[in-house]
Amino acid sequence: MAHYFVGDVQGCFAELQRLLAKVDFNPSRDELWAVGDLVARGPDSLATLRFFQSLGDAGKIVLGNHDLHLLALHGKLKRDKPSDNLTPLLNAPDISSLIDWLRQQPLMRELPEHKVIMTHAGVPPQWSLEVLRQESLLVSQALKQNDYLDALISQMYTDTAERWDPSAIGINRLRFCINALTRMRYLYVDGHLDFDCKQPPEDCSNPQLRPWFEFTSTLRNSHILVFGHWAALMGKVDAPNLKALDTGCCWGEHLTLWHLEKDQKITQKKLKKS
């Protein structure tokens, strides 16, 4: 069995298929792990979701911020923007099935035998593995409830839950987990989240900000952390236990696949429109 990890697909389905063909991916023997943001901006979010749903146990995804936003769009909590290219997906006859499937997906996954942890944006340096498991489980449980739109999705859009508080309860606790695992890039020196700067570290002009992965973390020392979200990094992180896989395919760059067993990255350039 081979374990393949893919960066933010964001509807770039043709590039994904080219990439999987390069490694002769076979769902009967291999697993495809995806760092989230399966949808939005690229030309075929519908085919992308259908494909991952069809993989069954051979597909392992975590939710990204765009995937959570799709839940809000489907629930009529937000309006669809043409630039996101989500109208065909939202109008699809099987949209309810796809949404139900998406709601069953977690914010983190782990591969214990290889000491690999996958989230969309990263892991707060303050968190142990036990805390990560606990907090992501709370969000997953909320997503599976019948009132998930009112109780969670409608209340997740805020920049106020930027500081980890282990005594927080209810929606405030869930908000921090969502913000950290799906939106995080930089932290202030005191450890709270910044939501504004998206530049690569060499271009960040705020001396108070540091990338989340530059803070001391016992989890990062013991595990390989696989993440996406931060396209401006273009996969370049100077640390052996970090695998940054978002390489901006939907922005015209390329899609990246990481073969765990070979510790090898394979890429596919964005295809030109025919």
UniProtKB/Swiss-Prot annotation:
Disulfide-bonded cysteine pairs: these are none
> Molecular function terms in GO for this entry?
bis(5'-nucleosyl)-tetraphosphatase (symmetrical) activity; phosphatase activity
The EC number on file is 3.6.1.41
Q: Which GO terms describe its biological process?
A: RNA decapping
Q: What Pfam family is a match, any one?
A: Metallophos
Cellular component GO terms held in the UniProt record: cytoplasm
Q: What HAMAP family is this protein classified in?
A: ApaH (MF_00199)
Protein name as it appears in the record: Bis(5'-nucleosyl)-tetraphosphatase, symmetrical
